[in-house]
Amino acid sequence: MAFRKSNVYLSLVNSYIIDSPQPSSINYWWNMGSLLGLCLVIQIVTGIFMAMHYSSNIELAFSSVEHIMRDVHNGYILRYLHANGASFFFMVMFMHMAKGLYYGSYRSPRVTLWNVGVIIFILTIATAFLGYCCVYGQMSHWGATVITNLFSAIPFVGNDIVSWLWGGFNMEDPYYSNMMLNKSVLCWNIFIWMMNYYIIQLIIYNNMIWNKNNMVKMFIMRRKLAVINMYMYMKLIIQRTYSYYMNNTIIYDKNHKLNTDNPIYAYIGGLFEGDGWITISKKGKYLLYELGIEMHIRDIQLLYKIKNILGIGKVTIKKLKMKDGTIKEMCKFNVRNKNHLKNIIIPIFDKYPMLTNKHYDYLYFKDNLLKDIKYYNDLSYYLRPIKPFNTTEDILNKNYFSSWLIGFFEAESCFSIYKPMNKKMKTASFEVSQNNSMEVMLAIKSYLKITQNIYTDKFNNSRMTTKSINGIKNVVMFINNNPIKLLGYKKLQYLLFLKDLRTITKYNNYFKIPPKY
């Protein structure tokens, strides 16, 4: 007997490839199924090797693909094999489906077989789309946005499903991490479904006798497939949890301390002083330490940027019912984790101290947090002092004041163009206000060389407005020349402000308005 027939392993290959009995009416169209299997193996193998070098991080995805093409040995061959293999996979699949339609493979008794093939086809389309999203760029970004927005057509829960798929209100890191993970799982699911497909073919084409032994064999095989599926989905859950953890932590330097040299943290400090809070509240007999910022819903993108920069906290939406019955939507970013507060927030505010009287709140907050005060009864009485923490000169001498000021403007400033009554020409206006912060307002006035007076109302809210040509010029030049830029809705307001400013002769003739920001 030939060795290929006597060997336990080779005999299996021999029975299916060499000595496999086939009907005389079979033709070359029946090669499509085996070619599909070959294409799938090529896709899985090349995909595994490329995944070793690919990063699903939103900032590294495109660079990692470039790394595969340029730095990985024969990486370009892997990528081209993967890309062209996908094209051939679909070409062969469509020919395979056309053969099935032509020969009536969808009719009884092969209905189940055809349905399994349809499921494989749908899974393949989904897998191809996920791979299309992995290279983070404009095309994949908007392609993913459009396709996933299809779920918004589902009544009642559509928008929630879209937000869940995105991992937030825009394309966040978890979305692209999940794309990569889901793609790998779907590849294995296609492989498993193809095994089912093959088993059903055996049942139909070889006229298997449904005796007790064969039923046991089929039962065992399907249980094995169920175990494989369960393993893959458990692996997916673990990977998604790990991905969520990695996307909600921040990178430390070698000494495990936050690197606060980036002036963007001064910007965040100014933003918190404008619209943020830092509190110790009672939760039963325990204390809840919290730092947060609340803004209008239009600034939700800004809060997500802050979350991504810090790597901690969460963003939520809440609806407020106004006195007139209308609903106002607000978004909130807050941090409650003590380790995050100690290791990230405190180093930032130690490096860039608050300039308003909120610094008293911070010192009280920091003292209790570092002492690990847990119970409400152990908390000492606190009342914010009235005396200013910093003088105007102290504020102006801070080397981070310009970066801090951009963040403060993001929260508390307003750019507007309006037409006064009985006047033909429009007027530009810049306004900034804050409660219990006269020294900060005086520092801003001095720093920007604004001549207008500061108005303080009976609630101790200080407001400064400038409409003069020189004042508007100083504000525009400061914002445009600052290395730290506006990041939220205020940026859009400022861009529209510049656009309208170019149409006002008295400003346009006096100084050169920046063409872009």
Curated annotation (Swiss-Prot):
Miscellaneous remark of the record: Encoded from partially processed COB mRNA that terminates with the in-frame coding sequence of the third intron.
Membrane-topology descriptor: Multi-pass membrane protein
UniProt keyword list: Membrane, Mitochondrion, Mitochondrion inner membrane, mRNA processing, mRNA splicing, RNA-binding, Transmembrane, Transmembrane helix
Assembly and interaction partners: Forms a ribonucleoprotein complex composed of maturase bI3 and 2 dimers of MRS1 that assemble around the bI3 RNA.
Compartments reported by the entry: Mitochondrion inner membrane
GO BP annotation list: Group I intron splicing; mitochondrial electron transport, ubiquinol to cytochrome c; mitochondrial mRNA processing; mRNA processing
Sequence ranges on the Mitochondrial intermembrane membrane side: 53-84, 137-145, 206-224
Record family assignment: In the N-terminal section; belongs to the cytochrome b family.
The protein's name: Cytochrome b mRNA maturase bI3
PANTHER family, sorted: CYTOCHROME B (PTHR19271:SF16)
MF annotations from Gene Ontology: electron transfer activity; endonuclease activity; oxidoreductase activity; RNA binding
One protein family per Pfam: LAGLIDADG_1
CC per GO annotation: mitochondrial inner membrane; mitochondrion
Gene for this chain: BI3
Region (Maturase): 170-517
Primary residence: mitochondrion
